[in-house]
Design a protein with these regions (language model features):
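Bacterial N-terminal signal peptides that target proteins for export
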Residues: 1-11
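C-terminal motif of bacterial Sec signal peptides marking the signal peptidase cleavage site
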Residues: 19-22
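N-terminal non-catalytic regions of secreted/periplasmic and cell-surface proteins
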Residues: 24-78, 109-114, 118, 125-194, ...
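Short beta-strand segments enriched for Tyr within beta-sheet-rich domains
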Residues: 63, 111-120, 179, 226-232, ...
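Aromatic sugar-binding surface patches on proteins
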Residues: 94-101, 210-216, 430, 529-535, ...
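Surface-exposed, short loops/turns at beta-strand junctions within beta-sandwich domains
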Residues: 104-111, 220-226, 539-545, 704-710
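Short, solvent-exposed loop/turn segments at the edges of extracellular beta-sandwich modules
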Residues: 120-127, 236-243, 555-562, 722-748, ...
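Extracytosolic secretory-pathway proteins
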Residues: 258-479, 595, 774-791, 795-800
């Protein structure tokens, strides 16, 4: 943590926050007393104009007077007027607040909403928003169709926080950029494609990037009165390769002076002192805003259930700009490296079945300076109305238990807290709400609503001081985990992962990581997610070769002064390939089944996909599967794929990987036409989308969600039997091939020769609604038949 100087300005700060005229922030004229004033809204989450709101977020309101009648007066609609059904409102704090959730699941991502009040009554009259409907916008989807991951096909910068107008650009500001679509973060390099400069000189800064967001945190305070320029270069790309509109842009601001600053120490009191599951204590302290356990983060996920929560605790050291200079919009900062500690969680599958894993303490580390502002109340001008608080922070979640840390460790970028601040006696009390959406095992986005409550210590001169971080970070675990040097649980295209005990400084890692193959340097890219370093070799891991992954003590944590990492290395090798190469086969196809079917046996309109070629006449027929609207097509292959052989078709009948809409009749059923003794179906149009080619996996993501009930098919091309094979099959789009040049085998029941290809694999499916279930893709580990030839060869693991 940066060194913090305590200034004797806290009493003056408290007077300013209380709204006294000495700070220039109070209004003249008689004071309205609450009992005589009309009823007003004091707080809303989301606030008016808020962006990147989680689709799972509730609406939270707080009022000047408690409700006296029914609470069914909140109306929510999309910007085009479509109403959103709401569940029964939940009164909070004796009717001084409401919590309202959608009745039918989450809101739509990337959508603008309007919130109105109609019929909410208090003893002081009806409640309404003073400036008409409140509007907010949900965040983009992190998964699903490509069209849900962006507002536009052209890449644009939507906003920069602070903007220098409504939110002043300070000498301690951290810049947070938000774009109109997900980014290709590999195109972001600080000092090249993106930079912050003063008089043409690059400002040393930490860059964090994830999804549609980028954070630039200067390593040292900026110089007040100096102009700083943000430059975005033409090489920045969106996730589908879209270039930045206009070929780049520049914006500049003059840094304003925050000095002399005041340090306010706030405690984060526990909801309960109960040692086991404190957030579930029925007698625990509750948030004024939500009625839920204060300072607890309940994690709601299908994989984990909704009954677990972690309780946050710790001291927060907040630096405030000199408030007499900023009486209306008052900037503040929480330094990079600050830490909150969460309580232990006992992991349960689906919230019911114990997984035998406990997280230990969960650490929330600030990866950059958190930037915040105390703002005038947007709904009320009377002095008793609390001030609004907005805080933007980038944090890492890590777990004390290495087993849990490998699954939990991740970065949460640009988390926004929105709350109220009010002076209560000698304390400044803040209640705020924020949403965290951590990934669970990389399979599901969980939802957690943080009901934050902090209180300043009444005697700031004797408040706790920051505890210096003197612990050296260390390597907790790696993937792969090698036994006797043999890494039997990974495949050639897998990434390498190093999980550390705490988050590391990304700049320090640049010269600290190394990867060698057979003693020679192996090129790689790397990324940092929480306390996990993900290493991706440029070439897939080569079976049989020895690799060494190492980190040196050049890597450090985020403390000031920084603590170097304990050096560590791991050596491993994949099982060697034995014997001659054979044709690759399909391990899984989603949706559908990994076999070419007898087209004389299928009746797609009736939901009958026929039986596998080479099978018996009395074999079961396969069903026509359904694919939920937000899921991709995913295919896994037994051997490394030759990327040059995979071509996505953009018209009917083109490409070696085809995704097509099927021609249908007036009832929406696919139309069959005779083809000798078989039936064939016609393409209506190619489905536009993006095909991701990995070492052994093909994933197709459509531009738009699959339509409910619509008929689709996807086809993997190959060439049947040796007689039909041509030398250019693997480069002409005729067949999907392995790196060894063997064509895809799709009909194993026909007993083909080991090096033969197979017939085209055509799988029909119907679009279906989004489901709440979680799709878990499982890999077949090469524990025995490493070369995937269907035999246990002498020399393979366990058989040599």
């Amino acid at each position: 943590m940066r060194s913090i100087r305590f200034a004797p300005l806290f009493p003056l700060m408290m007077l300013c926050l209380a709204g006294l005229t000495a700070c220039g922030g109070a209004e003249e004229g008689p004071t309205n007393h609450l009992g005589a004033a009309p009823a007003e809204v004091f707080y809303s989450y989301p606030y008016d104009g808020q962006r990147r709101v989680s689709p799972a977020s509730p609406v939270v309101l707080r009022f000047s007077h408690p409700l006296t009648g029914g609470a069914d007066g909140v109306r929510l609609s999309e910007a085009d007027g479509n109403s959103v059904a709401l569940a029964a409102p939940e009164p909070v704090d004796g009717g001084l607040g409401l919590l309202v959730r959608p009745a039918q699941g989450d809101l739509r991502p990337g959508t603008r909403y309007r919130l109105t009040l109609d019929g909410l009554e208090t003893e002081a009259g009806p409640l309404a928003f003073p400036d008409g409907p409140l509007t907010f916008e949900t965040r983009l989807a992190s998964g699903g169709a490509n069209g849900q991951r962006g507002f536009d096909t052209v890449l644009r910068l939507r906003e920069v926080l602070p903007d220098g107008e409504d939110l002043p650009f300070m000498d301690f500001s951290t810049l947070r950029l938000r774009f109109n679509q997900m980014l290709d973060t590999d195109t972001l390099t600080y000092g090249e494609s993106i930079s912050l400069t003063r008089d043409g000189e690059l400002v040393p800064a930490i860059m964090l990037a994830k999804g549609d967001a980028v954070t630039l945190d200067p390593r040292q305070d900026l110089r007040p009165g100096e102009r700083y320029t943000l430059t975005l270069g033409p090489s920045i790309r969106g996730f589908q390769g879209a270039a930045l509109a206009g070929g780049g842009l520049q914006r500049s601001w003059v840094a304003r002076d925050s000095r002399p600053r005041t340090v306010m120490v706030q405690e984060t009191p526990p909801a309960s002192g109960r040692g086991d599951d404190p957030c579930a204590d029925p007698d625990g302290r509750r948030s004024r805003l939500t009625g839920q356990a204060m300072n607890c983060v309940p994690i709601e996920a299908v994989l984990l259930g909704d009954g677990d929560a972690t309780q946050q605790s710790g001291n927060v050291f907040t630096e405030l700009a000199f408030l007499p200079h900023y009486p209306d919009v008052s900037p503040l900062r929480i330094p990079r490296g600050s830490l909150l500690t969460g309580s232990n969680v006992k992991v349960k599958v689906a919230g019911a079945v114990p997984a035998g894993i406990e997280t230990g303490d969960i650490a929330v580390t600030f990866l950059s300076d958190a930037s915040g502002y105390l703002l005038p109340n947007p709904f009320s001008r009377r002095p008793e109305a609390p001030r609004q608080v907005r805080l933007f922070m980038d944090v890492a979640m890590t777990a004390e238990n290495p087993e849990a840390n490998g699954a939990l460790s991740q970065t949460l970028l640009q988390v926004e807290l929105v709350g109220v601040a009010k002076v209560e006696g000698p304390r400044l009390v803040i209640d705020a709400l924020g949403v965290v959406e951590p990934e669970v095992l990389g399979q599901e986005t969980a939802f957690g609503l943080l009901s934050l409550h902090t209180e300043s210590y009444p005697d700031q001169n004797n408040a706790p001081a920051p505890i210096p971080d003197t612990r050296a970070p260390f390597l907790q675990s790696t993937m792969p985990m090698a036994e006797d040097g043999l890494a039997a649980t990974v495949q050639p295209g897998d990434a390498l992962v190093m999980n550390f005990s705490e988050p590391l400084d990304p700049e320090s890692l640049e010269q600290a990581l190394s990867l060698t193959r057979e003693g020679a340097d192996e090129p790689f890219d790397w990324s940092l997610d929480g306390a996990s370093v993900v290493v991706r070799p440029h070439q897939p891991l080569r079976p049989g070769d020895s690799y060494t992954l190492a980190v040196s003590d050049r890597a450090t944590d985020l403390a000031e002064p920084a603590n170097p990492v304990q050096p560590a290395s791991r050596t491993f090798r994949l099982p060697a390939l034995i014997g001659d190469p054979v044709a690759p086969v399909l391990i899984t196809t989603y949706p559908g089944f990994p076999c070419a079917v007898d087209k004389a046996s299928w009746h797609i309109a009736e939901g009958d996909h026929g039986r596998c070629r080479g099978g018996r006449a009395d074999d079961d027929h396969l069903p026509v599967p359904a694919l939920p609207a937000d899921r991709p097509i995913r295919v896994t292959v037994s051997q490394d794929i030759d990327p040059a052989s995979v071509r996505l078709g953009d018209t009917c009948g083109s490409g070696s990987f085809r995704v097509e809409r099927v021609a249908v009749d007036g009832d929406g059923n696919p139309v069959a036409s005779p083809d000798g003794d078989k039936r064939k179906y016609q393409c209506d149009a190619a489905v536009p989308g993006r095909l991701k080619v990995e070492a052994r996996t093909l994933t197709f993501i459509p531009d738009q969600p699959w339509e409910d009930g619509a008929a689709y098919r996807y086809t993997l091309q190959s060439v049947n039997r040796a007689s039909g094979q041509q030398p250019d099959d693997c480069v002409s789009g005729e067949a999907i091939c392995s790196q060894a040049g063997k064509r895809l085998q799709t009909a194993l029941l026909e007993g083909p020769e080991p090096d033969w290809g197979g017939p085209d694999l055509e799988i029909h499916f119907r679009g279906a609604p989004v489901t709440d279930s979680v799709f878990q893709a499982l890999n077949n580990l090469p524990t025995a038949d490493v070369n995937a030839n269907g035999f246990f060869d002498d020399g393979e693991p366990g058989y040599g």
